[in-house]
Amino acid sequence: MKRHNVRRLLALVLVAALCLLCGAAAQPNATEIHIYSADDLVQLSKSCKLDTYSQGKTVYLDNDVDLSGSDFVPIPTFGGMFEGQGHTVSGLELSGDASHMGLFRYVQAVSTVRDLKITGNIDAAGTLNEIGAVVGTNYGTI
């Protein structure tokens, strides 16, 4: 009877292990994010509302992206590696009374943003503190 229970337990453990392996193989690489379009950049901005979302991740800009007419808002906080790969983000339009304006509002100390071109307009009012095309407040490496 005990042998039978041990076999059942072993079988359950093996099935559980196989399920975990299949699930891990089906998921994309969670440490890489690829940006192909304005919609992808908008989604990145929404995801980066949580300050730890981008930490340990590398974001690749795989195409030139035109933000004209999109509902893009600056990426709130970024804590990973942003590889522009020589591509351009165009049509960046920022305006308002806020400070900390740029494609990224805050770049964390552990972050790097590189090989990126940006074109657009910034029309800021208020205190005009910490405003730039790439980042409003930078603690990382640009």
Where are these regions (language model features)?
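Bacterial N-terminal signal peptides
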Residues: 12-21
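Bacterial N-terminal signal peptides that target proteins for export
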Residues: 2-13
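Surface-exposed repetitive/solenoidal architectures
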Residues: 27-142
